[in-house]
């Protein structure tokens, strides 16, 4: 499920909040990057998939136990990193906030990025199943996505929603994307030769260069 059906609106979580500031009887919309929150099929996403709905009692417990995301950047640091030369300037600006299905996600992506056949092939395989001999394929696609696209509107928070849509809100798959997003320098996908050895590349005349990143 992608949004709450509860009529009561969630309160906004503030990074400066302490456990004593939390109303235990309220519900809060908490950005995923602020806490190491376990995502499950029952997790309620809000704000276009950038936040999860958390009860006040659980939020107070998270604050008391120091369960904040270790790699979550401060707002000022995030804004500064967005303007660093070479980090995002060469990426295509894409926002996945409105994507609610795999087809919508793919249309949003391909409208801005010229996907090489190997990445299109991975998308087709994810339609069949997300898990079961798919970890390496998810890793390669996630790395490609992070290295070729960015979102200046929400500093890539919508990428968590993209992973939730693409991988059918599978907890493990979504956390893999979150882990890569927290890295200062994300891994790059393997070169075309390595992709071919792993049966991830089927060589097309439409490709250029020696790495999938050359084709966007």
UniProtKB/Swiss-Prot annotation:
Span list, region Disordered: 67-88
Swiss-Prot/TrEMBL keywords: Transcription, Transcription regulation
Xref: Pfam families: Baculo_LEF-2
Stored InterPro entries: Lef-2
Keyword RNA-binding: no
A Gene Ontology biological process term: viral transcription
Keyword Zinc found: no
Biased composition (Low complexity): 71-82
Job description of the protein: Required for late and very late gene expression. Specifically required for expression from the vp39 and polh promoters.
Family assignment from sequence similarity: Belongs to the baculoviridae LEF-2 family.
Protein name: Late expression factor 2
Gene this chain is encoded by: LEF-2
